[in-house]
Regions:
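Extracellular interdomain linker/stem segments of modular secreted and single-pass surface proteins
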Residues: 194-201, 293-306
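Short, solvent-exposed loop/turn segments at the edges of extracellular beta-sandwich modules
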Residues: 179-182, 277-288
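Surface-exposed, flexible coil segments in extracellular/virion-facing regions
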Residues: 242-265
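Conserved Ser/Thr-centered positions that define the repeating blades of beta-propeller domains
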Residues: 242-244, 273-277
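A short beta-strand segment in extracellular, disulfide-stabilized domains
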Residues: 219-229
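Aromatic (Trp/Tyr/Phe) and Gly/Pro-enriched flexible surface segments
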Residues: 2-94, 105-108, 114-126, 133, ...
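Solvent-exposed loop segments of extracellular immunoglobulin-like
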Residues: 229-243
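Exposed beta-strand face motif in extracellular beta-rich ectodomains
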Residues: 99, 168-170, 268-272
């Protein structure tokens, strides 16, 4: 397992199991092979809730609000046989694009109760990615053992994946990779699948500045900018420069598709950013590419001439 070390796009898929207090609705048929219950689940069962340790007093008595969504979670009492915690199909992938599959996990056994030897049977979750027909395992990775603790805490785990030419759909899966018994009880939250790309900065050529201020009396001016990807993910780089007057609404600059870019004459406050993809076709989809932080060009007004 490992995180995207570059820039992360908006989630293509996110499962946060809902908000609100108490127990939520069961998962759709086929999502898990565990059995839904209201209240604390026993071996082979699960619930959707923001509350745990209602009947089982060896669990932590609350889920910490430290995930992305801070709502309900999938709470599972893992079985003696390896079971499927969760699966979902993902469509709309771009070809030759990098992605990150992540989730927050928590061992809910409270080791300070002493109910199990040591820290109890650890939880261990296997992440898998399958092709759209569920016939070929494309990638897998395991968290390793996550021991019970006297303190309740979430920890995020992730796996990266690169789609192939013509591949636009996959299936995400999460499996029990440990043994049933005293322990191996867990909560899962915020399962996210998102694009992953290089972290790219913009600077003037031969400079490291991330913004420029220009006095109004020196206008108009042209600035030579350069995109600086960190090469953490992409092996090839394709660019589309954009500009904005407010830093929120962006427009493509026709023909600006190289790492270096010379602005047209600037006469007012302007923002620039660059969209980066590993395949040129992915520049047409914001979910399959990444964006740099904005580069700001500030125009400083000329102060009024003092009156005599």
């Amino acid at each position: 397992l490992g995180f995207c070390s570059g820039s992360k796009g908006d989630p293509i898929f996110q499962e946060d199991f809902g908000s609100g207090n108490g127990t939520g609705n069961p998962l759709a048929a086929g999502v898990t092979n565990y059995t839904y219950v209201v209240g604390d689940p026993q071996d082979g069962q699960y619930t959707i809730s923001d509350q745990i340790s209602q009947q089982i007093n060896t669990w932590h008595n609350a889920l910490p609000n430290t995930t992305a969504s801070n709502g309900r979670a999938l709470v599972v009492n893992a079985d003696y046989t390896a079971g499927l915690f969760y699966q979902t199909p993902i469509s709309g992938l771009c070809e030759n694009a990098s992605y990150e599959f992540s989730a927050y996990l928590m061992n809910i056994f409270n080791s300070s109760t002493g109910a199990c030897p040591g820290t109890g049977i650890p939880i261990n979750v296997r992440f898998e990615i399958w092709n759209a027909t569920d016939t070929q395992l494309l990638k897998q990775g395991s968290t390793g053992d996550i021991a019970g603790s006297s303190n309740a805490f979430w920890e995020q785990y992730a796996m990266t994946f690169q789609s192939q030419a013509g591949q636009n759909s996959i299936i995400l899966k999460m499996f029990n990779n440990s043994d049933g018994g005293c322990g191996n009880d867990l909560a899962i939250d915020d399962i996210i699948f998102r694009s992953c790309g290089d972290l790219t900065t913009i600077s003037p050529i031969n400079s490291s500045e991330n913004e420029i201020s220009i006095c109004e009396e020196n206008l108009p001016q042209t600035i030579n900018l350069e995109a600086n990807p960190d090469f953490s993910i992409y092996s090839d780089h394709y660019y589309q420069w954009q500009r904005s007057n407010d830093g929120e609404t962006w427009n493509d600059i026709p023909g600006a598709n190289q790492a270096q870019f010379s602005t047209s004459s600037i006469s007012t406050d302007t923002y620039f950013r660059v969209q980066v993809a590993e395949d040129p076709v992915n520049l047409d989809d914001n979910l399959c590419s990444t964006f740099s932080e904005a580069f700001y060009v500030e125009v400083i007004p000329t102060p009024p001439t003092p009156s005599s």
